[in-house]
């Protein structure tokens, strides 16, 4: 039997006091993923986290651990459902009756990076506190995911000349591990899974800046994301056909992002090529860093990206609306509102 890591033992101690009383009528939202969905777990695991410093949070007056100028996608989804924002799982003072956020900046599906909760750690944390909710609540709750970007960005940095076969093998490895974690959540009662698929990662301002591609996207990173998204779709469809009660949706974030990048003015953006906060050729590095003098745009709603890899609040709000109520050309096989009321 695999021995628990020291990091997870420490996490276990943090979670022991969190079995809180709940309302029998509560609606639950469980958030898994990385910094796109992290609303404050990272500061419990590391010091001087940029998202806890200005100008993060400037649209809501203060930094709060979110990697944006304001609210992130799960915040808006919670608002649409009429429930409180799902608090960070590592906040021992929080009330988890309406759900919880396991997502943590730097999280991956594979590997064991330091000072984060991998997807495996997040699922273990859910297993540890699952009795916080009744069986019925866990079955009716929504399990939201944005995960995998760090796996492919790390792979790109280390394997810039990877062959097609090597790329395919790595994507298969990532999806196989992700499937294992979904099966674990299903075994813990999860039935309704909502995925925001991966962005065209090669088009992130930080990637363009790091790899000096100018206004062009880095093909390898975006190709890996596209392969991941295709295999994810096939895997979820297979699980829905083989597991009783397994339901899912996928928001096509990849193509939705490309549409915004192709016609920024149609979406009210000045630019989708540069970040609002940061330094460098694309203003993509250093936002919130103590010892970096970053540029800050004067109107963050004119930017798709707040920093080099995270969306501005305006973009997050638009994404949340699409996840919640768009038609099947954007979110399929149903939208989140339909999934929530699905038997």
Curated annotation (Swiss-Prot):
Its main location: secreted. One of its GO terms (cellular component) is extracellular region. One of its GO terms (biological process) is lipid catabolic process. The active site is at 35 (nucleophile), 307, 310. InterPro entries: GDSL, GLIP1-5/GLL25, SGNH_hydro_sf, SGNH_plant_lipase-like. Its EC number is 3.1.1.-. Glycans are attached at residues 95, 154, 161, 238, 255. Residues 1-26 form the signal peptide. Has lipolytic activity towards triacylglycerols, vinyl esters and phospholipid. Of the triacylglycerols, the highest activity is towards tributyrin. This is GDSL esterase/lipase. It comes from Carica papaya.
């Amino acid at each position: 039997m695999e021995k628990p890591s020291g990091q997870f033992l420490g996490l276990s101690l943090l979670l022991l006091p969190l079995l809180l009383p709940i309302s029998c009528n509560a609606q639950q939202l469980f958030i898994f993923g990385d910094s796109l969905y992290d609303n404050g777990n990272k500061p419990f695991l590391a010091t001087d986290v940029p998202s806890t410093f200005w100008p993060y949070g400037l649209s809501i007056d203060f930094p709060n651990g979110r990697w944006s100028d304001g609210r992130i996608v799960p915040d808006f989804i919670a608002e649409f459902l009429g429930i409180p924002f799902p608090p960070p799982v590592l906040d021992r003072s929080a009330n988890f009756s309406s759900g919880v956020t396991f997502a943590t900046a730097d999280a991956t599906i594979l590997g064991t990076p330091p000072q984060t909760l991998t997807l495996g750690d997040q699922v273990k944390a859910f297993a540890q506190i699952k009795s916080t909710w009744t069986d019925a609540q866990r079955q009716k709750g929504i399990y939201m995911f944005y995960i995998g970007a760090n796996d492919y960005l790390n792979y790109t940095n280390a394997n810039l000349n990877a062959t097609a076969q090597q790329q395919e093998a790595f994507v298969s490895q990532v999806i196989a591990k992700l499937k294992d974690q979904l099966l674990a959540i299903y075994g813990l009662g999860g039935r309704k899974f909502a995925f925001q698929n991966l962005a065209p990662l090669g088009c992130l301002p930080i990637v363009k800046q790091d790899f000096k591609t100018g206004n062009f996207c880095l093909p390898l990173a975006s190709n890996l994301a596209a392969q991941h998204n295709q295999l994810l779709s096939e895997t979820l469809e297979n699980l829905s056909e083989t597991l009783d009660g397994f339901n899912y949706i996928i928001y096509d974030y990849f193509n939705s992002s490309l549409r915004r990048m192709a016609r920024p003015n149609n979406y009210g953006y000045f630019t989708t090529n540069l970040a609002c906060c940061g330094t460098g050729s694309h203003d993509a590095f250093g936002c919130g860093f103590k010892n970096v003098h970053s540029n800050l745009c004067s109107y963050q709603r004119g930017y798709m990206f707040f920093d080099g890899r995270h969306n501005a609040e305006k973009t997050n709000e638009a994404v949340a609306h699409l996840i919640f109520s768009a038609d099947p050309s954007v979110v399929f096989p149903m939208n989140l509102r339909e999934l929530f009321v699905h038997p």
